[in-house]
Amino acid sequence: RALMSTKKETVLRDLDLPALQAFGWNKDDQHQLEAWRNLRTPSDRGEAGLASCLARVIAVERTGLTVAPHLNAPDGHVPVSGRWFRGDEETRPTIGDWVVIDAQTGMLLDMLPRRSVIKRVNPLGALQLIAANVDAALIVTSCNADFSLERLERYLSVVLEANITPVLVLTKIDLAEDPSVFIEALSQRFPEIAQVAVDALSEGAAAALAPWCTQGQTIALLGSSGVGKSTLVNALSGAAVQQTAA
């Protein structure tokens, strides 16, 4: 099933850039595509040529992946064969991966090399992938009893290890009697890390985070439950795309 040289160019030549850019495609991903083409021989890529397309993983389920854009499947579902789950955890697709899909069968053919990946060791000691190809990570905490410098250090360690830009986001400043106490604690402990204090329900929240949310940038939100991550997602999206706590 080796591809002819004319087919090698098809994935690159037929990119629907506007559709991909809507899901975070940027020049760094373009470089990863070039690296994929250079690293994979025709036999390695199987049929990933003339009848294939690129998409991004937005969810991982037991039955397969949900990807976007996926013109041939309205629900974005991509079946995944067993071979993808027989190898190491890091070889399996995760949220944020750019994948090559057979445009005719809708099957997963290959993945582009990752430029970053957030991962952790779960309570059972197994490696767990969180997200791939992330540009900036918003590490969210709040002005209340959840505030923990030690927890923030753990998140920072994960993000910096992945070579991702960290941003410390302090939420619920409108509910704190004296938010400056929390702001000062962050500044003293993490002087070299970008920090933003916001009321996630205010109109200014999106503007404060805009430098890390430009077109083509992919951000991840990390933080414990209840710190306002869903509220921030809604603020950045300009719509209620995530349900928030009462």
What are these regions (language model features)?
Residues R1-L149:
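N-terminal accessory targeting/assembly segments
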Residues E150-L160:
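Histidine-anchored nucleotide/phosphate-binding helix
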Residues A239-A246:
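Switch I (effector-binding) loop of TRAFAC-class P-loop GTPase G-domains
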Residues S52, G216, A239:
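Short coil/loop residues immediately preceding or within conserved phosphate-binding loops
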Residues L175-V227:
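Canonical P-loop GTPase G-domain recognition
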Residues L129-A132, L160-A162, T214:
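Conserved catalytic network of the ASCE P-loop NTPase/AAA+ motor domain
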Residues S230, A235:
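Walker A/P-loop
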Residues V134-T141, E161-I173, P191-V198:
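Conserved beta-strand/loop subsegment of P-loop NTPase cores
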